[in-house]
A protein has these predicted regions:
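The feature marks short, hydrophobic/small-residue-biased sequence motifs that occur predominantly
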Residues: 75-119
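Membrane-proximal extracellular/periplasmic loop immediately following the first transmembrane helix
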Residues: 28-87, 276-279
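Hydrophobic secretory-pathway targeting helix
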Residues: 1-39, 329
Length: 329
């Protein structure tokens, strides 16, 4: 009876070990989604440096050339956000509250859905799906007319992944206070700002993938240390269990090498360059604070959700280790 109970306990420990590996695999999966997600740099301009239409056109004149020669972002948008606005369908006498984005440049760098407006289409707009429902009772709203502020607009399409949003082109005299840049490196963002004499603080959600990968490195390290410690003991009965653990460790290492890549921002000229690590840590802390404080689009909120899933899955194996100490002792 005692031997049977002992075997059941060992089987339970193996099951929990496998469960920890499964959680870890999901953590790697969510990390891979986060790594592949397009990261957008948001630049909030200083209060006295709003961008006019002339500023935007000046950038666009040399955009294609600079993109190829200086590895500048593939897309950019100059925009501003106006909250607490009202959109109205006069024919049905329906209104709803919306946040208005007035955008010069690429819309797709800001919204997750496919959306295209001509640069001079001041009478066109896009509506979020729920906004279209409130105004028209349907998401088939293209071609319908609405009023927002002093402007009469024609709906060009519906944004499926956004909420309470209306996107339009700003009028000629309007200034914008934000810049969005498509996926690129931090160094390229700084080069972009310097090249065009723009001022503002860059912010991005790309650092979330860096945090996620560091969390994923912890469990294999702890597991390897435990395996090395277990080699000092001789438990013939546990030979199969040890083999299983080594297989799991090898699988984790394979997943790590296949999916994790150390970003260039974390590679110093010399590993003993302590000033580099000090500056990197300071910059990393600033990114976290900026991300918490920044106005997030649906894309950033979705990436934050994926990060949380990866972080939870990375932490679950440690919870299982603690549980095993209680069950398997």
């Amino acid at each position: 009876m005692r031997g049977l109970k002992c075997q059941k306990g060992r089987l339970g420990c193996l099951v929990m070990t496998l469960a920890g590996f499964i959680f870890y695999a999901f953590g790697v999966f969510y990390y891979s989604l986060l790594k592949e997600a397009p990261s957008v740099w948001h630049i909030v301009c200083e209060k006295d440096s709003g961008q006019t239409e002339e500023d935007y056109e000046r950038v666009m004149k040399t955009w294609e050339k600079d993109r190829q020669e200086k590895d500048f972002p593939l897309a950019c948008a100059f925009w501003k956000k106006e909250e607490g606005q009202t959109a109205e369908n006069l024919s049905l006498n329906r209104t709803c509250d919306v946040t208005v984005w007035k955008v010069r440049g690429s819309l797709e760098v800001l919204v997750q859905s496919s959306a295209v407006l001509n640069e001079d289409d001041w009478q066109g707009c896009y509506l979020a799906e729920d906004t279209a429902w409130e105004l028209f009772g349907s998401t088939e709203a293209a071609g319908n007319k609405i009023v927002c502020g002093q402007r009469r607009l024609t709906v060009r399409g519906v944004l499926k992944d956004e909420t309470s949003l209306l996107v339009m082109r700003p009028e000629t005299k309007e200034t914008t206070d934000r810049i969005a840049l498509g996926m690129t490196l931090a160094a390229h963002v700084k080069g972009f700002l310097m090249s065009y004499g723009l001022r503002g603080k860059p912010m991005s959600s790309g650092f979330l993938a860096e945090i996620a990968q560091w969390l994923l490195l912890l469990y294999p390290g702890v597991l390897a240390a435990g395996f090395l410690k277990s080699l000092k003991n001789d438990y013939p009965v546990w030979a199969a269990g040890k083999i299983l653990w080594w297989i799991m460790l090898a699988a984790m290492v394979y997943l790590l090498f296949r999916n994790i890549k150390i970003p260039e921002t974390m590679i110093p000229g010399k590993w003993s360059d302590f000033q580099f690590w000090k500056d990197w840590w300071k910059s990393f802390q600033e990114q976290i604070v900026c991300f918490v404080q920044m106005d997030k689009t649906k894309r950033e909120l979705r990436q934050a959700g994926i990060f949380m899933k990866s972080a939870v899955c990375s932490a679950m194996p440690f919870f299982i280790i603690a549980l095993k100490k209680e069950v398997c002792q």
